[in-house]
Curated annotation (Swiss-Prot):
One of its GO terms (molecular function) is tagatose-bisphosphate aldolase activity. HAMAP family: TagBP_aldolase_KbaY. One of its GO terms (cellular component) is cytosol. It is an enzyme of class 4 (lyase). GO terms for biological process: carbohydrate metabolic process; D-tagatose 6-phosphate catabolic process. The keyword Metal-binding applies. Belongs to the class II fructose-bisphosphate aldolase family. TagBP aldolase KbaY subfamily. The active site is at D82. Its EC number is 4.1.2.40. Its cofactor is Zn(2+). It catalyses: D-tagatofuranose 1,6-bisphosphate = D-glyceraldehyde 3-phosphate + dihydroxyacetone phosphate. This is D-tagatose-1,6-bisphosphate aldolase subunit KbaY. Keywords: Lyase, Metal-binding, Zinc.
Length: 286
């Protein structure tokens, strides 16, 4: 087993009408918790790390952990660079073995976004690395990234078509009403916009900001063509909440083997639910 490109995972998902969950990772415990569930449920998985994650724990260490777990659980997995904005940073990490990258130029005007993404695609494809890009812009907060509501905008279907044609990108993250983080009220998802994008764009579509979105909404986006579902905030909240509760009950506790396991178990329940929502269980052979 090995670290593979997301391209192969998403192509199968697109052909068979399900989505691959992409879970954000932060340390060894979060990687282990996610993969314990994915192994049990035989679900393909994408482990996504933001630039902030790779500042916290070195790429080489994350890559070694993922490679070891891939062998332990006898399953392929994808290690994905989430919301990276630097070409040079992506090049370095691809040379180190990563085979999936998101170059985020969504804050640039269309032409500049195209230019940036095309340059990354040209390099990454020479290394068998798949590339995701974003058109439109999600609001909210994720790690070091913060986008206010006034700066967020939805994806235009015809621009999406042109963007994919001009860049050769392997998958496209679309802005259809979700946001990073949690919601103060139920999000208004533009399903019609998603359907119109699907009609003119052939590559796999990606839903960012899926934390806290009602399950039935996520299922509907998958029916309309989403093949990768990103989850971050819900994982962190479950983990942190369980650890806080453990310390409230065990104020003198100090053994990370106990409180980390409590956090991991809480996170695993979120992972299990998202796999069921995505319909990705039993998609890889035992």
């Amino acid at each position: 087993m090995s670290i593979i490109s997301t391209k192969y995972l998403l192509q199968d998902a697109q052909a068979n009408g399900y989505a691959v969950p992409a879970f954000n990772i932060h340390n060894a415990e979060t990687i282990q918790a996610i993969l314990e569930v994915c192994s049990e449920m035989r679900s393909p998985v994408i482990l996504a790390g933001t630039p902030g994650t790779f500042k916290h724990i070195a790429l080489e260490e994350i890559y070694a952990l993922c490679s070891a777990y891939s062998m332990t659980y006898n399953m392929p997995l994808a290690l994905h660079l989430d919301h990276h904005e630097s070409r040079d940073d992506i090049r370095r990490k691809v040379h180190a073995g990563v085979r999936s990258a998101m170059i985020d130029g969504s804050h640039f005007p269309f032409a500049e976004n195209v230019k940036l993404v095309k340059s990354v695609v040209d390099f990454c494809h020479s290394q068998d690395c798949s590339v995701e890009a974003e058109l439109g812009r999600l609001g909210g907060v994720e790690d070091d990234m913060s986008v206010d509501a006034e700066s967020a905008f939805l994806t235009d279907p015809q621009e999406a078509k042109r963007f994919v044609e001009l860049t050769g990108v392997d998958s496209l993250a679309v802005a259809i009403g979700t946001a990073h983080g949690l919601y103060s009220k139920t999000p208004k998802i533009d399903f019609q916009r998603l359907a119109e994008i699907r009609e003119v764009v052939d590559v796999p579509l990606v839903l960012h900001g899926a934390s806290d979105v009602p399950d039935e909404f996520v299922r509907r986006t998958i029916e309309l063509g989403v093949t990768k579902v990103n989850v971050a905030t819900e994982l962190k909240i479950a983990f942190a909440g369980a650890v806080k509760a453990w310390f409230a009950e065990n104020p003198q506790g100090n053994d990370p083997r106990y409180y980390m396991r409590v956090g991991m178990d809480a996170m695993k329940e979120v992972v299990r639910n998202k796999i069921n929502v995505c319909g990705s269980a039993n998609r890889i052979s035992a």
